[in-house]
Curated annotation (Swiss-Prot):
NCBIfam families: adk (TIGR01351), PRK00279.1-2 (NF001380), PRK00279.1-3 (NF001381), PRK14527.1 (NF011100)
Subcellular location: Cytoplasm
Record note on quaternary structure: Monomer.
Family: Belongs to the adenylate kinase family.
Protein name, per record: Adenylate kinase
Catalytic reaction(s) noted: AMP + ATP = 2 ADP
Enzyme class: transferase
Recorded superkingdom: Bacteria
GO biological-process terms attached to the record: AMP salvage
Name of the gene encoding the protein in the UniProt record: adk
Keyword list, A-Z: ATP-binding, Cytoplasm, Kinase, Metal-binding, Nucleotide biosynthesis, Nucleotide-binding, Transferase, Zinc
């Protein structure tokens, strides 16, 4: 079961990823985790990636793709994997096709959790955090009993700067522009499966399980 998981910020990707890997016993492979593991193991590619990250620069595609190749070649990926955060561009998607071809495998599905921008705005701008204990609330989905007061410690709640409407809107627009060519690429390949992420978390996962039901565990 070889899967790629996509979705805009706030679509609920993380929650669904946890359920998929728990149920199907495949590793959840995120770009960040791959970089951290490669750097910890001090592989040649890991050290190259570290040199860019330490300077605050983007890791070049050739290094990222090399790290992905190393990771997908490990034993725990023999029964499949869930890729999250890679690929981000069509060039990376084409490189992934080459990697899998060399391994004698193909992608089964690219699962795209779709939520419209207005709903994502509501989800992302509604978050509030306690200044004192760090507890997280949501004005719509998980509000505190008393407005702007933490239920746990009585601390004041605040909105992070990057959760304000203008910043969130810009972030979503950037992500939309980046992912559209990738979604088109996978749609043309026949891998793309759009899942309605506006539903309740359990219903979203039920749809994913229905999709994966035809694949061998």
């Amino acid at each position: 079961m070889n899967l790629v998981l996509m979705g805009l910020p706030g679509a609920g990707k993380g929650t669904q990823a946890e359920r998929i890997v728990d149920d199907y016993g495949i590793p959840h492979i995120s770009t960040g985790d791959m970089f951290r593991a490669a750097m910890k193991e001090e592989t040649q590619l890991g050290l190259e990636a570290k040199s860019f990250i330490d300077k605050g620069e983007l890791v070049p595609d050739e290094v990222t793709i090399g790290i992905v190749r190393e990771r997908l070649g490990k034993n725990d990926c023999e029964q499949g994997f869930l890729l999250d955060g890679f690929p981000r561009t069509v060039a990376q998607a084409e490189a992934l096709e080459d990697i899998l071809k060399d391994l004698g495998r193909t992608i089964d599905y690219v699962i795209n959790i779709k939520v419209d921008k207005d709903a994502l705005m509501e989800r992302l701008t509604g978050r509030r955090i306690c200044k004192n204990c760090g507890a997280t609330y949501h004005l719509v989905f998980n509000p505190p009993a008393k407005e702007n007061v933490c239920d746990k410690c009585g601390g004041e709640l605040y909105q992070r700067a990057d959760d304000n409407a203008e910043t969130v809107s810009t972030r979503l627009e950037v992500n939309l522009k980046q992912t559209e060519p990738l979604l088109n690429f996978y749609s043309e390949k026949g891998y793309l499966a759009n899942i309605d992420g506006a539903k309740h978390i359990n219903d979203v996962y039920a749809d994913i399980k229905d999709l994966l039901g035809g694949l061998n565990k």
